């Protein structure tokens, strides 16, 4: 293989990566408080830590499940599964145009349920990450190298979105708390 041919193959790969990164660049940004950014980070990181092998697009809704202790994002809604649902339904997730995720938890996510307990354990881990990082910049700089390709691309978009939104509001400190699960669940019930 000649050097030219080798570079051509690398360029094609690079073009695809650049296209994916461009597609994951945030749009429709607004300023966010540090608490809003923490909430967006927590729920977005939950979705991005889930297993999925498909390309997601802003504006579409996906279903989140807890399958044998692992988060799994699916194109298939619970009512479409019938008796073959892979695990406990957690809620609906929507990728916003600013590359953050919104999560609407299912009403079955009640206190002391396995899903509730798994979410509390997840939030404990996120709380430790936020406190250990000391700043948004340090937190967002830590790439999720263990994630599959699509999730890494989306994590890059999330980091860019939060950086820009925090810069618009003049915020840079990491909040000492993470969103309370009970608070999030009760806010959703009030909205319904």
Region spans (language model):
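Domain-scale macromolecular recognition modules
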Residues: 52-106
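Mixed-charge (acidic/basic) macromolecular-recognition segments
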Residues: 3-25, 107-192
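A general marker of short, structured functional hotspots
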Residues: 37, 58-61, 118, 145
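N-terminal domain-onset segments
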Residues: 1-57, 190
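Sequence-level detector for tyrosine residue identity
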Residues: 41, 60-65, 122, 149
């Amino acid at each position: 293989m000649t050097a030219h041919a080798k570079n051509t193959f690398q360029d094609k790969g690079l073009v695809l990566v650049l296209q994916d990164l461009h597609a994951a660049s945030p749009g429709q940004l607004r300023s966010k408080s540090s608490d809003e950014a923490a909430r967006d980070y927590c729920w977005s990181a939950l979705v991005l830590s889930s297993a999925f092998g498909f390309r997601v697009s802003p504006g579409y809704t996906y279903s989140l499940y807890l399958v044998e202790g692992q988060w799994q994002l699916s194109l298939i809604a619970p009512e479409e599964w019938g008796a073959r649902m892979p695990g406990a339904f957690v809620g609906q997730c929507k990728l916003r145009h600013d590359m953050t995720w919104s999560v609407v938890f299912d009403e079955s996510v009640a206190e002391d349920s396995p899903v509730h307990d798994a979410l509390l354990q997840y939030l404990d881990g996120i709380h430790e990450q936020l406190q250990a990082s000391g700043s948004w910049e340090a937190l967002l700089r830590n790439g999720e190298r263990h994630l599959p390709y699509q999730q890494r691309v989306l994590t890059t978009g999330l980091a860019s979105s939060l950086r820009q939104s925090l810069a618009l509001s003049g915020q840079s400190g990491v909040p000492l708390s993470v969103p309370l699960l009970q608070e999030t669940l009760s806010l959703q019930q009030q909205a319904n």
